[in-house]
Curated annotation (Swiss-Prot):
Subcellular location: Cytoplasm; Nucleus, Nucleolus
Name of the featured protein: Small ribosomal subunit protein eS7B
Function noted in UniProt: Component of the ribosome, a large ribonucleoprotein complex responsible for the synthesis of proteins in the cell. The small ribosomal subunit (SSU) binds messenger RNAs (mRNAs) and translates the encoded message by selecting cognate aminoacyl-transfer RNA (tRNA) molecules. The large subunit (LSU) contains the ribosomal catalytic site termed the peptidyl transferase center (PTC), which catalyzes the formation of peptide bonds, thereby polymerizing the amino acids delivered by tRNAs into a polypeptide chain.
InterPro entries: Ribosomal_eS7, Ribosomal_eS7_CS
Organism from which the protein derives: Saccharomyces cerevisiae (strain ATCC 204508 / S288c) (Baker's yeast)
Phosphoserine found at: S10, S31
PTM notes: N-terminally acetylated by acetyltransferase NatA.
Amino acid sequence: MSSVQSKILSQAPSELELQVAKTFIDLESSSPELKADLRPLQIKSIREIDVTGGKKALVLFVPVPALSAYHKVQTKLTRELEKKFPDRHVIFLAERRILPKPSRTSRQVQKRPRSRTLTAVHDKVLEDMVFPTEIVGKRVRYLVGGNKIQKVLLDSKDVQQIDYKLESFQAVYNKLTGKQIVFEIPSQTN
């Protein structure tokens, strides 16, 4: 059990976090090609978010420095985790912190870095969410009531890997940031 605890950086892990950590350890022991890559990886926390159609999305929050290591094995790891947890889409996101905007009344000790601003964190969440695919364009549509809908255009070369998850991406992004978003994969007509 101590090896399961070592995969989770949380003090009091939930039942779902323990199940995912156990799956990580099972994958380490069963597949030799993933063993070296999975050993140093840890999870900060996991959230389960409801998506339309009775599906759920498992959002695994990982430390920011470990994100590049996760990207190396993300396609294989996602496939294996989705086999173990059916009817759930697995999404890896880095745990990022947003610092409040400095005001006149608050004492400013250090200048707020660009990477900790709300806009930068939301853009990085979007990039992490659609990782194997690249974002090729963004459009903002303003509705009559003043609401905004962001349209994100994804690269069409990875349609098979990502097409079935687009609704999950929309629900997760809306839940985490409060912004409405629509994903679109433009068709290649040459």
